[in-house]
């Protein structure tokens, strides 16, 4: 299947052959299942997710509506591994998302064009880390002026605004550091903070962290769920990244 791409000045991306679809998809999903995120920085996590999603899209398993279905799959998968994401960015920047996937999978040696993940990574930084990179389609056209990533990088949010850090008490900061980029049980967080009195931990640490929007439960409608875990919101991750 071929589709002329505006961002490639009319050229096309090669998709996986239909007879290889199942094998290619199973391979990518198995690789992801066995991948460990432990010890990775958020930048590395985002880069890995971008690469994984780009590979799924390029296999083109969904036929018509492949990009839209890839977006739905991505949202569900990110939620399953602890990220609080929704459809808003995909809806607002659907064309950018598609063009970024095209650029991530396009190679033309004769024209000197190699696959470029940078645009997709900017998209996922906005989605997963709450950053505010400028997402412009015109920057992605092959052989476009070199202002693309330079302009986008200027909006990087490596520093957390002072207002955010001013909200932090010592207990809030300690729970943010204890959770990091993981999904943690209550017991695990208490062990990392070295607290043994559960009511004190819930009253002084967990409840304020949730009320201030730094931490969210995996099962918000069922606080006593047997597999309940907690993870950082985008706001919490911003604080965590600023402390590293």
Predicted features, each with a name:
Residues 1-244:
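FIC/Doc superfamily catalytic core
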